[in-house]
Amino acid sequence: MANDLKLILELSAGAELLFGNIKRRQLSLDGSQKWTIGSLLKWMHANILTRSPELFIQGDTVRPGILVLVNDTDWELLGGLDYELQQNDNILFISTLHGG
């Protein structure tokens, strides 16, 4: 639809393994509602997270060790879960959780 919210979703450093090994997705979300990072995380959990949700989600947020960047800016500087997503935002999730 013309009023859909279009985003680029990127997953790297192992986060993509939880989402079917797809590192980059173009999303088109229902533009009739307000989308925040928090609502995007719920959508991701319900629609594209394919395994081990406990490695990505903890409560209502990402697990510690998952960095979130919005247009190359740390999401915490933008309001964290409450950041309202904008047309053509690039959301990047980077896992810093590694075995050893």
From Swiss-Prot:
Modified residues (1-thioglycine): 100
Pathway(s) served: tRNA modification; 5-methoxycarbonylmethyl-2-thiouridine-tRNA biosynthesis
Native source species: Drosophila willistoni (Fruit fly)
UniProt crosslink position (Glycyl lysine isopeptide (Gly-Lys) (interchain with K-? in acceptor proteins)): 100
Signal sequence range: none
Database matches in SUPFAM superfamilies: MoaD/ThiS
GO biological processes: protein urmylation; tRNA thio-modification; tRNA wobble uridine modification
Quaternary structure note: Interacts with cer.
Subcellular location: Cytoplasm
PANTHER family in UniProt: RURM1 PROTEIN
Name of the featured protein: Ubiquitin-related modifier 1 homolog
GO terms for cellular component: cytosol
CDD domains documented for this protein: Ubl_Urm1 (cd01764)
Matching InterPro entries: Beta-grasp_dom_sf (IPR012675), Mopterin_synth/thiamin_S_b (IPR016155), Urm1 (IPR015221)
Function: Acts as a sulfur carrier required for 2-thiolation of mcm(5)S(2)U at tRNA wobble positions of cytosolic tRNA(Lys), tRNA(Glu) and tRNA(Gln). Serves as sulfur donor in tRNA 2-thiolation reaction by being thiocarboxylated (-COSH) at its C-terminus by MOCS3. The sulfur is then transferred to tRNA to form 2-thiolation of mcm(5)S(2)U. Also acts as a ubiquitin-like protein (UBL) that is covalently conjugated via an isopeptide bond to lysine residues of target proteins such as Prx2/Jafrac1, Ciao1, Eip71CD and GILT1.
Keyword list, A-Z: Cytoplasm, Isopeptide bond, tRNA processing, Ubl conjugation pathway
Family membership noted in the UniProt record: Belongs to the URM1 family.
Main subcellular location of this protein, as a coarse class: cytoplasm
Family matches, as HAMAP family: Urm1
Post-translational modification: C-terminal thiocarboxylation occurs in 2 steps, it is first acyl-adenylated (-COAMP) via the hesA/moeB/thiF part of the MOCS3 homolog, then thiocarboxylated (-COSH) via the rhodanese domain of the MOCS3 homolog.
